[in-house]
Regions:
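Mid-to-C-terminal alpha-helical segments outside catalytic/metal-binding sites
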Residues: 2-4, 27-38, 47, 51-66, ...
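Bacterial N-terminal signal peptides
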Residues: 10-22
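An N-terminally biased module of ancient metal coordination in phosphate/nucleic-acid-related enzymes
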Residues: 26-109
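Hydrophobic faces of well-ordered beta-strands that scaffold small-molecule active sites
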Residues: 36-40, 66-69, 122-126, 153-155, ...
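Active-site beta-loop-alpha junctions enriched in small/polar residues
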Residues: 41-43, 71-72, 127-131, 157-160, ...
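Catalytic pocket-lining loop regions of alpha/beta-barrel enzymes
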Residues: 161, 166-298, 367-374
Length: 375
């Protein structure tokens, strides 16, 4: 009898608690959340990665929400070059990268395989477009109308990126290409949040060399003041180091009312190395984040992690920075700014989809090769 009472009072409630919890993320566990991850790749450069259900287990109770995307580029495997060695990363082969549009359908279907409660923890992003192509905007619209209710933004996509840009097949993407302007104009119209990667400088610049990247990205931001843009990694790369007085430059830029739509993510362990390289670098970074607490987001930039420890290692790396932040700045960096920006984008994008989902499909005009005569 005592065992029966014990079973009813303890075991059965525990069973239902487990049954209705969301992959270990019960309602009462929100206080344990350390991070809303604004920058995460579910798949790698050969479109392989972590199963999304497994990734929910990796997130556990420590990560609340995640901006979810793949990699827009596929690394080519050229047998005549590497033989049976199948490269899985862009630094592992001399062969080109090419844009892989199916990544958006893959991310959408992974998201749609989840329950509504699980879906609420993700903000899928569109990445499978070529930013040098005037048709890129048409691809983005097509993805939204094919998968309504799924996507929140676009990115991470790259314009100038060390090693990568020169490997992409076809015309190189540039900051002054009208195709990019067309993309960002549509994001302003639809409410899509943008995650843009553009290096702040070229690799191994010579002393006194002109930094043309800075002026071009300033001009881009000025042309698109109605588009919410997250500048990934603050322009820093694996070998693209922070430029001289970068924090002072960033301070000046963020102070301008004309840049109120620009946000910075400090994702990637390579960026964390630079920020924590010296006490001075850490203090300077903390000072700017404390001054503009609404403008920074935290992401991991991990690619297809296999366990929680490797997924969240960046949080330990950034501890010296976190220790110098005010409570308000730390909360907004780690969680609050994500919720504000992505929640707003969700509402706007759903409204755009509702207004345009039944738009008539345009019939393209006949071309000389089609053999169809104009009426």
């Amino acid at each position: 009898m005592k065992f029966k009472t014990f079973f009813i009072r303890l075991v059965i409630p525990l069973f239902f608690l487990f049954l209705f919890s969301n992959n270990g993320f019960a309602q009462g566990s929100k206080d344990s959340v350390l991070l809303n991850d604004s920058h995460f790749h579910l798949t790698n450069y050969v479109q392989e990665g972590t199963d999304i259900h497994k990734f929910l287990e990796i997130m556990g109770n420590k990560v609340g929400r995640v901006a979810l995307f793949g990699i827009p580029l596929q690394q080519m495997w050229n047998y005549n070059n590497s033989g049976n060695f199948a490269p899985t990363y862009y630094l592992a082969s001399d062969d080109p990268l090419y844009y892989y549009s199916f990544t958006d359908a893959y991310i959408a279907m992974a998201y749609k395989s989840l329950t509504k409660e699980q879906q609420a923890r993700f903000d899928p992003m569109i990445t499978g477009f070529n930013p040098a192509d005037m048709y890129a905007t048409d691809h983005i619209k097509r993805v939204l109308t094919t998968f309504p209710g799924v996507f929140t933004g676009i990115g991470e996509f790259s314009i100038h990126k060390e090693f990568v840009s020169s490997k992409v097949a076809g015309p190189v993407a540039t900051l002054n290409n009208p195709a990019l302007d067309r993309i960002l104009d549509f994001c302003a119209e639809s409410g899509l949040l943008v995650i843009l990667h553009n290096d702040i400088n070229m690799p191994f610049p010579k002393s006194g060399q002109e930094n043309w990247d800075i002026e071009q990205i300033k001009a881009l931001f000025a042309r698109h003041r109605n588009t919410p843009i997250i500048w990934a990694h603050c322009g820093v790369g694996r070998i693209v180091r922070p430029i001289k007085d970068q924090m002072a430059m960033l301070d000046k830029a963020l102070a301008s009312p004309q840049s109120s739509n620009i946000y910075i993510d400090i994702s990637w362990t390579e960026v964390a190395k630079y920020v924590t390289e010296t006490p001075e670098a850490t203090a300077n970074t903390a000072a700017v984040i404390n001054k503009y607490p609404d403008r920074f987001l935290m992401g991991t930039d991990e690619v297809a992690p296999s366990d929680q420890k490797s997924y969240l290692k960046i949080l330990d790396m950034y501890k010296p920075l976190f220790d110098k932040l005010t409570p308000e700045a730390k909360q907004k960096l780690l969680k609050g700014n994500y919720e504000r920006l992505f929640d707003a984008a969700r509402v706007k994008v759903r409204a755009w989809e509702k207004a345009h989902i039944n738009d008539p499909k345009k019939i393209p005009p006949p071309t000389p090769s089609s053999g169809i005569e104009k009426n």
